[in-house]
Amino acid sequence: MLKTHHKNSRGRLVDTFSGIVQIPVDSMHLEAEWIMPPNASGIVIFAHGSGSSRHSRRNQFVASVLHESGIGTVLLDLLTRQEERRDAADGQLRFDIEMLTNRLITAVRWVEDHPAAHDQPIGLFGASTGAAAAIAAASILGERISGVVSRGGRPDLAYEHLRHVTAPTLLIVGERDDAVVRLNKEASQHLRCLKKLSIIPGATHLFEEPGALEKVSSLAAGWFKKHLARETRQNEIHREVVEV
């Protein structure tokens, strides 16, 4: 990764390590954008949703807010460029949750072993079908994942994994995304970990309404900042909160 400079929200020039990395998966490589702000307290790996990629404006925005909170990010493409073209035509790969989960797990292990990770705690952020992969990966990796956030996710697609998740999990949905609200409420009942369902007033599935994505980003940053701290993870109390 390369050392670069940028101004933080206070206008101060700070050092950031960033770059495009190639993560080996089976006989191919997946591309990811890895950014580590100064004195990062953890790393969040993004699993993008249906028809999306690491260039997603929404996930890029969420990632920038995490950087301001001192959290590194890995925006991962779970499909190769060739697969993305095929998926754009038939939409099948984006719903292959088992494949996406296996690739995400491989990416987590690769990041863990990378010298730049510095043994930082790892969280997962998933959107749409990527949220199902994040939840499934968290259930399989167990204590190696310190927190999960789902944005407009489809946790129902990882139904058999829900009760095995141990990482604190935040489900964020838009109030006007009726079907996804219902699916997330049902999924929340099957989670046995510390969990929270946050419903953003007036928001639809893509959180395009004024202030909606900012609220999502703030919630995600707060969740990861709290739960990626090792001392917090050791004293979690299992409970459920629903917020509107």
Which stretches of residues belong to each language-model region?
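Serine-hydrolase catalytic machinery in alpha/beta-hydrolase-like enzymes
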Residues: 20-117, 209-211, 215
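Alpha/beta-hydrolase fold nucleophile elbow
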Residues: 116-128
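Active-site loop->helix "elbow" adjoining a glycine-rich segment at hydrolase catalytic centers
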Residues: 128-131, 153, 176
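A conserved short beta-strand
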Residues: 143-155
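Short beta-strand/loop motif that positions the catalytic acidic residue
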Residues: 165, 171-173
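Conserved alpha/beta-hydrolase "acid-adjacent" motif
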Residues: 178-183
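Catalytic histidine neighborhood in serine/cysteine hydrolases
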Residues: 191-206
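Catalytic active-site module of serine/aspartate enzymes centered on a nucleophile-bearing elbow/loop
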Residues: 211-244
